[in-house]
Regions:
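Residues that define the transmembrane beta-barrel architecture of outer-membrane proteins
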Residues: 36-38, 66-70, 121-127, 141, ...
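Outer-membrane beta-barrel translocator domains and adjoining extracellular loop/strand segments
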Residues: 52-59, 99-105, 156-164, 207-215
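Predominantly the C-terminal beta-signal and adjacent terminal strand-loop region
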Residues: 190-237
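Surface-exposed strand-loop-strand hairpins of Gram-negative outer-membrane beta-barrel proteins
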Residues: 47-71, 75, 174
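Extracellular loop and loop/strand-boundary signature of outer-membrane beta-barrel proteins
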Residues: 27-28, 58-63, 112-118, 165-171, ...
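Bacterial Sec-dependent N-terminal signal peptides
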Residues: 1-25, 234-237
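Gram-negative (and chloroplast) outer-membrane scaffold detector with strong preference
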Residues: 25, 29, 34-38, 46-52, ...
Length: 237
């Protein structure tokens, strides 16, 4: 994920350092792009998602092994006023997180090495409604900040699955709410607008579905489990 962040920073630096942006003879690409009431596009990106745990008892933390996931979706942009836009960005977000439990969670219980690990796969239909606050356009780029709320449906939640961790299945909730904040830069190229952005995403509601046994070593000590993560998206409009 560090390499992805460095790539994002390099793209921004390379574009803003381009002589065309600051030369006296400026060529303004897509001059009327921001005057459109409605505009459309799509995005591709990466995510790195974690869990934030709140525990009932003081035990060693559940470790989360994160992996780089994938984002893809569409964009609908409504111009509210000169520097404010309302954006709907429905898409698909896929990620996998592996949980590792300390042996102390299984005191007095027979267990195997596989019991100490659980895989949590998430496939979200992700629908954010965002407000974008832009600065004044400078030649062919325009920085902005963005924030809003999102609803998500986790197609891999297994919430209704009768099998729980006693059968090897870690269950999560299907319906989720998030808030997100971030920033990015619009680059006006010859034929389209290219926008790299980075965002922090934070779950509002608890995601864990408790096991049937209230004293389950996997969920009994979890008071809440909330997703948090970073999105890096590349947008084309």
């Amino acid at each position: 994920m560090r390499q992805v962040v460095l790539l994002f920073a390099f793209l921004c630096f390379a574009q803003t350092s381009n002589a065309q942006l600051f030369s006296k003879e400026k060529i303004r690409n897509l001059e009327n792009e921001d005057k459109k009431r409605l505009s459309w596009g799509y995005y591709l990106g990466f995510n790195n998602m974690d869990f934030n745990f709140d525990y009932n008892e003081d035990k060693p933390d559940i470790l989360v092994d994160k992996s780089v996931g994938f984002n893809v979706g569409l964009i609908g942009n409504l111009r509210i006023m000169e520097y404010i836009d309302l954006r709907l960005e429905p898409g698909l977000t896929i990620t996998t997180r592996n949980l590792t439990y300390d042996e102390s969670y299984f005191d007095g219980i027979e267990y195997t090495e596989s019991d100490l690990m659980r895989e949590v796969k998430s496939t979200y239909i992700y629908i954010p409604l965002l407000v974008k606050f832009s600065s004044k356009r400078l030649n062919n780029f325009k920085p902005f900040v963005v924030g809003g709320i999102s609803t998500a449906i986790n197609l891999s939640s297994n919430e209704k699955n009768p099998d729980d961790n006693s059968s090897g299945q870690f269950r999560t909730k299907t319906n989720m709410l998030f808030y997100e904040v971030g920033f990015g830069v619009d680059f006006y190229l010859a034929f389209f607008k290219f926008t790299p952005s980075i965002r922090g995403v934070f779950a509002i509601n608890d995601e864990v579905v408790p096991d049937v046994d209230p004293n389950s070593p996997w969920t009994g000590n979890i008071n809440s489990m909330k997703t948090r993560g970073v999105f890096i998206n590349l947008t084309f409009q």
